[in-house]
Amino acid sequence: MFVDRLVVRVAIKCLVLLSAGFSGIFAQKIWGLSVALFVLSVFFQAVDYLISHRLTTLVLERITGVLEAVYACCDFSAEADVRATVFAQSPGRKDILRQIGKYYPTNRYSSFRRGLSTSKGIIGFCFRNQRRYLEVIKKEASFKAHLVENWGFTREEADAVKVRRSYLAIPIFDAHGKVLGVAYFDSVKEHTFTPERIDILTRGCVPLAKWIG
């Protein structure tokens, strides 16, 4: 930001000097300096973008690695169709959680990729109350109606959610006990998340704090 402002100020001063009648080598040197500063600014912006992109890729790789590891430890059956992902507080928006990376192992985003209110669903409940939450929806129950009546979703939002029968949300804390986000798991089966698996997932997701903090 400092470089950008400096470039603008120098460029304006150069134009003023040139318009005031300066010419020859002196004016050319000033103009050349402004061009050099502009090019330097573009270069640093490009470097900053590349570093930021690389860091983002690295973070996503690490998060996926953690989810993959705990997933494998639980030995879920293929029929359970378990998915795992992470939601973290959106920068500058305390009331919004954003999905960090795609679901593992399906490699797809949820319908709330652009943001989920902390007031909705078990993910929001887990984040607000800073405690783990497991929910099982019986087959005979209406999944869509349940989301609307119990979790604050609109009908349109509920229609966009893929039908699942069991959900597990685990809060992710930093070293000071502040909740940073939520590790989320769901399944098409009712009894997928046994106490043993919940314990494995809870302990296994602790390292996520390093990558979303």
What are these regions (language model features)?
Residues 156, 165-174:
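A short, aliphatic-rich beta-strand micro-motif
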Residues 98-162:
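Regulatory sensory and allosteric helical modules in signal-transduction proteins
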Residues 27-105, 110-113:
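Intrinsically disordered, low-complexity terminal regulatory regions
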Residues 1-17:
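Juxtamembrane interface helix immediately N-terminal to a transmembrane segment
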Residues 64-76, 92-95, 122, 128, ...:
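Amphipathic secondary-structure elements and adjacent low-complexity, charged linkers
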Residues 179-213:
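Juxtadomain coupling helices with adjacent low-complexity linkers
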Residues 1, 22, 39-43:
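Long, hydrophobic/aromatic-enriched structural stretches that serve as scaffold segments
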Residues 19-29:
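Juxtamembrane "helix-exit" motif on the non-cytosolic side of transmembrane helices
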